[in-house]
UniProtKB/Swiss-Prot annotation:
Sites bearing N-methylleucine, chain numbering: L5
Cited PROSITE patterns: PROKAR_NTER_METHYL (PS00409)
Membrane-spanning parts: 5-25
Protein name per the record: Pilin-like protein PilA2
Phenotype of gene-disrupted mutants: Mutants have a wild-type piliation phenotype but are deficient in transformation.
Natural source organism: Thermus thermophilus (strain ATCC BAA-163 / DSM 7039 / HB27)
Annotated membrane topology: Single-pass membrane protein
Gene that encodes it: pilA2
The protein's role, per its UniProt record: Plays an essential role in natural DNA transformation but is not required for pilus biogenesis.
UniProt keywords, alphabetically: Cell inner membrane, Cell membrane, Cell outer membrane, Membrane, Methylation, Periplasm, Transmembrane, Transmembrane helix
Propeptide residues per the UniProt entry: 1-4
One CC-aspect GO term: plasma membrane
Entries under InterPro entries matching the protein: N_methyl_site, Pilin-like
UniProt subcellular location: Cell inner membrane; Cell outer membrane; Periplasm
Keyword Nucleus: no
Amino acid sequence: MRKGLTLVEVLVTLVIMGIAFAALLTSQLANLRASAQARFATDAKAAAVQVLERRSAEVLKSEIVPALSPYKDAPLDPDNPSGNWRSFYFVDYYFSCPTRVAPSPKQRGGSVANLRPGLTCSGTETIFGIPVAWDIRGENGILGEGVVTVVVTATHPRGPKVTLGRRVTCYDVYPSPTQDQPAPCPPPGGGRP
């Protein structure tokens, strides 16, 4: 009667254990890869959100200008049109991006010269080492009247790509409970051609 294991039995046991450990290792590596890709996608989304918020805030920005400014949109005091006015960057972006077109005659005198010069409609920023391309466009047609679309695409160097968009309307800029058509909104039929 023999005691112990034969060499063949030991080798078979080692092969079975090796296969089990290889399967476990492969599973762990797949999980690590998936976790890393998810983290990269999260980083890309964080960068995209940061640029989207910054560009949206630029479109929503307004400032106080004197009555003689070509950029005036709405008087601060309707009873005193020679006083200060509010100027909405929304109007500039809507009629300048992607190409400059004349605003409606009721806005900025209908002149391209009354739109702020030098607005950038697209570009690329790098956030956390992730390049983020952005694009601002005034929509055209009846469904696009008074709508500016901001789209950003972040592409992580290690793979994931995230695209986010936001539609900013003239009502986001100047929500007026007393007017059907607040100052930054083009009049019906007065949007981009």
